[in-house]
Design a protein with these regions (language model features):
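Short-chain dehydrogenase/reductase
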Residues: 1-87, 174
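Hydrophobic structural elements of the Rossmann-like NAD(P)H-binding subdomain
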Residues: 66, 118, 159-162, 172
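Ser/Thr-centric signal marking residues that sit
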Residues: 15, 43, 104, 145, ...
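Structural signature of beta-strand start/N-cap positions in the alpha/beta core
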Residues: 11, 61, 116, 158-160
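Low-complexity, Gly/Pro
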Residues: 37, 162-163
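Catalytic loop of short-chain dehydrogenase/reductase
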Residues: 1, 70-109, 113-154, 165-169
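Active-site loop/turn elements of alpha/beta-hydrolase fold enzymes
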Residues: 17, 42, 122, 164, ...
Length: 174
């Protein structure tokens, strides 16, 4: 997505956290143009509160945001649905669904008129084998996007999800 955006003339700022930060750095190295990277933990309110300041170091405003964030602890995947502890479920839902709202609202002050938020999704209508609480989190992501679209439409902010089909992720390996 970042490469295509740059090829269309967009300036891109990337975020990452934890193990994902090193992956983001590797991906940034393959882009046609250098892209700044901001460390962002969507479960850390201080990171979210400081996001506008960090982005403004590179861009005056945002035309759009891509939400490509998802995580579920190993205990929330792999066929242990009935025995998963709430802490693991809460982590999956916070990182994979609530973060769409958190990220969108953290970026809202930077949105230019007509801004767009696009999130990456996977089919939450099917109880996929071993996907377990990540499937529930994806269903929550879909619902979250509808409520954000309802509430931010008045600000001319569009919220959409796209499902690219199965992608090799940690959750897919379960």
């Amino acid at each position: 997505i970042a490469r295509l955006a740059q090829e269309e003339g967009a300036q891109v700022v990337l975020t990452g956290f934890g193990r994902g930060l090193s992956l983001t750095t590797r991906i940034a190295g393959r882009l046609p143009k250098p892209a700044p990277i901001i460390e962002l933990d969507v479960t850390n309110q201080e990171h979210l509160d400081g996001l506008v300041t960090e982005v403004k170091k590179h861009l005056p405003h945002l035309d759009g945001v891509v939400h490509s964030i998802g995580f579920a602890p190993e205990a929330a995947l792999g066929g242990n649905f009935l025995n998963t502890a709430w802490e693991d479920v809460a982590t999956a839902v916070q990182v994979s669904a609530y973060s769409l709202k958190s990220l969108t609202m953290a970026c809202h002050p930077l949105f230019k008129d007509g801004a767009s938020v696009v999130g990456l999704d996977f089919d939450a209508q099917v109880a996929w084998p071993k996907y377990d609480w990540m499937g529930v989190a994806k269903a929550a992501l879909e619902s979250t996007s509808r409520y954000l679209a309802r509430d931010l439409g008045k600000d001319n902010v569009r919220i959409n999800l796209i499902a690219a089909g199965p992608i090799r992720t940690i959750a897919a390996k379960s």
